[in-house]
UniProtKB/Swiss-Prot annotation:
CDD domains associated with the record: GT2_GlmU_N_bac, LbH_GlmU_C
Cofactor(s) needed: Mg(2+)
Gene name in the database record: glmU
Substrates-to-products reaction catalysed: alpha-D-glucosamine 1-phosphate + acetyl-CoA = N-acetyl-alpha-D-glucosamine 1-phosphate + CoA + H(+); N-acetyl-alpha-D-glucosamine 1-phosphate + UTP + H(+) = UDP-N-acetyl-alpha-D-glucosamine + diphosphate
Full protein name: Bifunctional protein GlmU
Length: 452
């Protein structure tokens, strides 16, 4: 049997004024990824699946984010905000192209899963014409109740319109919906705005489907999965739920998190086998950590690639563009940026390595910095394999340190150093015999007695 195709419409036109943010609501991040990106990543994305995103007229950045995450996304603009059904019909052109299953979701529900989208479609294959996603609310106050009789959805009753018996229902409307594509436009066009706000409500689709003599049904998911994000407090709650998911998934894959609740991961973090993450580590977007690597406490990583059995920290900061080879070591109070550090190289302490390539097994002494910025442009430092950079050295880029070369401690290197050479740049040390005693004696003669 040929697989059914689908169109998912994600509504992302809301203003999000309660977020008190200059960002459109759906661009606020959870686990290093925008709310919208989480939803788009979970939505069906096979060869027979299409995606449409409805945005507000002043939110081009939302459309840009949608295209970044899903290049196949079609962007539609809701010129006026006149309700959820009106928002869906902003994508009328996409609906008119036809689909077996029409899915409707919201861009501010980052915890929804691909599995839930798949389950939402199943009743459409078994005779239902409309499926609503529901959840059992710990406190249903304010939610629309899902009225079910004989296993079929008969109504979505808003709090103000619910009877005393209906108010006892804890099964609530999550807003996410699937409609048989053959009737979708007909149903949506029948939704009116004869209500106090004069808006077109998607929930009215249930009554229209039943009036057509068709079946509406419900599937359930957890309350956490359908949390809508409208405030910064709710954003923090979603972050907590997402971090728990990510930590559990990492440990299930063989990662050792010594104190899981203190480790923060990004949605796209990838791990090899036998990775160890010590307490109080923050991993931002774009990080991959290979087999056997250890990330020590109080380290921060973003857009970095960590090789097998490499070590990072404690108190290290790996900024975007950092790549550690197998067995490389980044120690305490080291910062790297746009740095390729090859296998076995060591940068053990108190060092800044930026816009640099460090060859295999090179050793970078404490206090070394690559002086990569001249106030206008960034410049690169090349350090050859097996090179030894003495402590407290400044390497003024652009500069190359040859394979096996040595740089004496305290040097300021401004010229290339040949392979196997020693480069030393410092003033000649002098010692003045008796100077310290003469200095102390002079100070003692001129010092006033302290008052008691």
């Amino acid at each position: 049997m040929t697989a059914r195709n689908s169109l998912t419409i994600v509504l992302a036109a809301g203003e999000g004024t309660r977020m008190r943010s200059s960002l459109p609501k759906v661009l606020n991040p959870v686990a290093g990824r925008s709310l919208l990106a989480h939803v788009l990543s979970a939505a069906p994305h096979g060869e027979r699946d299409r995606l449409a995103v409805v945005i507000g007229p002043d939110h081009r950045a939302v459309g840009d984010e949608a295209k970044r995450v899903r290049s196949d996304a079609a962007i539609h603009i809701q010129a006026q905000r006149l309700g959820t059904a009106h928002a869906v019909l902003a994508a009328r052109e996409a609906i008119a192209e036809g689909a077996d299953d029409l899915l409707i979701a919201f861009g501010d529900t980052p915890l929804i899963s691909a599995e839930t989208f798949a389950r939402l479609r199943e009743p459409l294959h078994d005779g239902s014409s409309l499926v609503v996603l529901g959840f059992r609310a710990a406190d249903p106050t304010g939610y629309g109740r899902l009225v079910v009789q004989d296993g079929k959805l008969t109504a979505i009753r808003e709090q103000a319109d619910a009877s005393a018996d209906e108010l006892k229902i804890t099964l609530c409307n999550a807003g996410v919906m699937a409609i048989d594509g053959k009737i979708a436009l007909d149903v949506l066009d029948k939704i009116g705005n004869a209500n106090a706000k004069g808006e077109y409500y998607l929930t009215d689709a249930v009554g229209i489907v039943r009036d057509l003599g068709l079946i509406a049904s419900v599937i359930e998911t957890s309350e956490d999965e359908v949390r809508g994000i409208n405030t910064k407090a709710q954003l923090a709650e979603a972050e907590t739920v997402m971090q728990t998911r990510l930590r559990l998934a990492a440990m299930a894959a063989g990662v050792t998190l010594i104190a899981p609740e203190t480790v923060y991961l990004a949605a796209d973090t990838t791990f090899g086998k036998d990775v160890v993450i010590e307490p109080f580590v923050v991993i931002g977007p774009g990080v991959s950590i290979a087999d056997g690597a250890v990330i020590h406490s109080f380290s921060h990583l973003a857009e970095a690639k960590i090789g097998s059995k490499a070590q990072v920290g404690p108190y290290a900061r790996l900024r975007p563009g950092t790549s550690l080879g197998d067995g490389a070591k980044i120690g305490n109070f080291v910062e790297t940026k746009a740095a390729q550090i090859d296998a076995g190289a060591k940068v053990n302490h108190l060092t800044y390595i930026g816009d640099a390539h460090i060859g295999a097994s090179a050793n970078i002494g404490a206090g070394t910095i690559t002086c990569n910025y001249d106030g206008f442009d960034k410049h690169k430092t090349e350090i050859g394999a097996g090179a030894f950079i003495g402590s407290n050295s400044s390497l003024v880029a652009p500069v190359k340190i040859g394979t096996g070369a040595y740089v004496g401690s305290g040097s300021v290197i401004t010229k290339d150093v040949p392979d196997d050479a020693l480069a030393v740049e410092r003033n000649v040390q002098t010692a003045k015999d008796g100077w310290a005693k003469r200095f102390r004696d002079a100070k003692s003669r001129h010092r006033k007695p302290k008052a008691h």
